[in-house]
Amino acid sequence: MTAPQTPSSNFLWFLPTHGDGHYLGTSNGGRDVNFGYLRQIAQAADQLGYFGVLLPTGRSCEDSWVVASAVAPWTERLRYLVAVRPGLQSPSVAARMTATLDRVIGGRLLVNVVTGGDPVENKGDGVFLSHDERYEVTREFLNVYSDLLSGKTVNVAGKHITIEDGRLLFPPVQSPRPPLYFGGSSDAGIDVAADTVDKYLTWGEPPAQVAEKVNRVRAVAEQRGRKLSFGIRLHVIVRETNEAAWAAADDLIRYVTDDTIAAAQKVFARMDSVGQQRMSELHGGRRDKLEISPNLWAGVGLVRGGAGTALVGDPQTVAARIKEYQDVGIDTFILSGYPHLEEAYRFAELVFPLVKSLHAGNVTPLRANTGPFGETIANEHLPNAKQAVKP
C-alpha cells in the first residue's frame, strides 16, 4: 500500500507529567515519571523533529510551568505548549510568567488556554463559577493578557476582572505575543475562540465530526473578521503492520476491568465540559465497539479523561488517516502514545517519512534587543535610553 502524499503539518508530542507506562488502568508496567524521564522524552522529541510538546495541566499533573522551565534548557528547537488558567491566575501575573518563560527559552513558548471542565476540581482550586461564567472570565482574561503582552497599558473594569494601570515592563521574545491555542466545544467556548485565539483545538473525533466543528468555528471567526488555524489532539499506536498495531491496542487495555471503567466514567459524567461529553459518547463506556471510525480507536477514553482516541495502524494507514484530517482543515497534530518515550520514536521513525512538516515556515517573529538594559527605576520605569557621552 502506498501512502498518499500529505500536506504540510506540525506534529507535537506530549510530556506525561501525570504518569506513564505500558498499560492503562494498572500499576503493572508503570514507569517512574521523574525529571530525568521527562527530560529524556523532550530531548528525544527535539532530536526526532517534533515541533513541540504539550504539557498537561490540572491537579493530576506536575506544574507545567515549572516543568517546562526546567526541561527546555536541555533542548534546542523544541517548543513548549504550556497552559494559562483563567480564573486561577491573574492575567497580569500570567502575562509576566509568559513573557519571562518566552525570554528564558528563546521564543519557544506556545500558550494553551484552559478554562477547566471539572466542577469538582475547580472547587478544589477555589473556582465556584458556572460553565458559562468560566468562559466569561476566559474572555476578560484573554483581552487583558493579550493587551499586556502586546505592550499596552491596561485599565479595565469588567464583570469578573478589574485592572488599573496594568503594564508589562519586559516583553516576550515573540511578537506581538506567543501563539494562543484553545479548545472548547460548547457555544460559549466557540464564541470566545472566534474572538481571541490563534489556533482552535479539538479532541480526536471522527473526521466527519471534526469537519463539522472546524467549519462552524471558521464561519463564526470569519463573521468577525478573523481567521483561525486548527489542531487536533490524538493518541497514536503505530506498528509495522496493522495486525501488530491492533494487537498493541488490545494489549494497552488488557488490565482494564469493568469496575475500573465504571469508576472512570462516573468521574467523567460529573464534568460539564462539552468536549469531554462528546469523547465519552464515542464509546458509551463499552469495550466491544471501540473502533468508532476506520482506524480510530476509543479504548483510551474508557479510563482516561480528555483525549481518548488513538489512530491505530501501520505507517501507511496512519498517514492516510492523518491526511483525512488535513483535508478538513487540521494543520497541527498533538500526539501521544504509551509508553511515551518509545512511541515518540515509533511515530517519528515510521510516519514522519510519509508526511510533510511546516516547521520552518511557522515561527512567530521574534523581537530584537528586548533588554532590559540596566535596573528598573523605583520598580516602575525602565531606565532612560542610552545617551552619547559628551566630550
UniProtKB/Swiss-Prot annotation:
Q: Please name the NCBIfam families in this protein's record.
A: alk_sulf_monoox, PRK00719.1
**EC number in record:** 1.14.14.5
The answer on whether this UniProt entry bears the keyword Metal-binding reads no
Does this entry carry the keyword Electron transport?
Answer: no
Q: Which family is this protein grouped under?
A: Belongs to the SsuD family.
One GO term in the molecular function aspect is:
alkanesulfonate monooxygenase activity
Q: What function is annotated for this protein?
A: Catalyzes the desulfonation of aliphatic sulfonates.
Record-linked Pfam families: Bac_luciferase (PF00296)
This protein's UniProt keywords: Flavoprotein, FMN, Monooxygenase, Oxidoreductase
Q: Which InterPro entries match?
A: Alkanesulphonate_mOase_FMN-dep, Luciferase-like_dom, Luciferase-like_sf, SsuD_RutA_monooxygenase
Native organism: Rhodopseudomonas palustris (strain TIE-1)
Q: Which reaction does it catalyse?
A: an alkanesulfonate + FMNH2 + O2 = an aldehyde + FMN + sulfite + H2O + 2 H(+)
Q: What protein is this chain from? A: Alkanesulfonate monooxygenase
Q: Which domain of life is it from?
A: Bacteria
GO:BP terms for this protein?
alkanesulfonate catabolic process
